[in-house]
């Protein structure tokens, strides 16, 4: 695993003065919505809520993916049920939609893959973003 991360014991130890977001689809709460079920996701959300109170925000993203739509529906329900504020965010890997192909080429160079190789998981596939919606969006486009 190559992305830095911390465990909950460290979060508990250094929780003061932190603001916490539930994260993207790989965050604990959205991931549990998609992979384990709403009950487990809600239990995880309650842990974060008890620890951070008003400093916890439910993060919503819209990159045009079906799994995001499913997670967002449940996250909005949780926000209303538990009175947790919502924050809209967008993962950005490039500044404009026109740069999506250049970013995909960069990923191919990094991984030593050809762009013609299909995006997916496992043998015969390569890493890539699911669509071209990972650009920095203006306020009007974002809303």
Please provide the spans of the model-predicted regions:
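Phosphodiester-processing cores and adjacent nucleic acid-binding clamps
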Residues: 1-143
């Amino acid at each position: 695993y190559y992305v830095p991360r911390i465990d909950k014991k460290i979060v508990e130890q250094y929780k003061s003065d932190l603001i916490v977001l539930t994260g993207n689809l790989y965050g604990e709460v959205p991931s549990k919505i998609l992979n384990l079920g709403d009950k487990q996701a809600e239990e995880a959300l309650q842990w974060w809520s008890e620890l951070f109170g008003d400093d916890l925000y439910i993060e919503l993203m819209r990159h045009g993916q079906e799994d995001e739509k499913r997670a967002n529906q449940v996250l909005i329900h949780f926000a209303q049920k538990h009175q947790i504020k919502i924050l809209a965010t967008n993962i950005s890997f490039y500044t404009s939609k026109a740069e999506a192909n250049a970013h995909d080429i960069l990923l191919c160079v990094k991984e030593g893959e050809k762009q013609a190789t299909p995006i997916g998981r496992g043998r015969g596939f390569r890493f890539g973003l699911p669509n071209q919606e990972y650009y920095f969006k203006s306020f009007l486009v974002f809303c």
